Structures are given as C-alpha cells and as structure tokens.
Amino acid sequence: MTDLTIKIGGNYVWIDAAVVDSANNKTPLDLVGADPATCEIDVTSGKFARLVISASGDQGSQVTADVLRGEKSVCLKRFYKINADGHLDRAVTFDPDA
C-alpha cells in the first residue's frame, strides 16, 4: 500500500474527485478543509493510478490538483481551467510509487 495526500484547490462551486488504483479500486475523496481541500488515502502499489476530477464553477476559474506520496514527495501537480459551459471533467494517470 502507498499513502497518498491529495490536495485540490481553486475557485470552484462544487467538486467531486476519486482515485482509481492499479487494482481498479475506486476511492472517493472526502475532501475537507479550506483551499486547498485535503484528503489522505491508501492505494495499492503498482504501475499507475488515476485521479478523476469533476468540478463546476465560473468559466476560466482555476482548479489545482496535487498528489503527494507521504507529505512531501510530489507524484502529480496539475492546473486546470473550468470550461465555457461551467464544468470540468478530467482524469490523469500517475505513478503512486514515484
């Protein structure tokens, strides 16, 4: 198992996110706290995992996503903008053991 810390921030009205690990286990993120909202999870070690984000807000608003192994080792860092229709749907693959 690999311990991950997920941080999602930005200017959004609503957000939903999950991590799917290499064993196809889906872990919905219970994001808590202020910007950035944070969640700690365990995933099966393996070649990949996917972070899946759905959000809504004002067009052009930025959403940030950071995945850390432990508290400091960065596995993933992404910046997205909410689309013209007010929605954002993204899935990105990363190595949880990196």
Give the label of every model feature segment:
Residues 1-20, 41-98:
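Beta-strand-rich recognition domains
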Residues 24-25:
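Short, glycine-anchored, charge-dense loop/turn motifs used at functional sites
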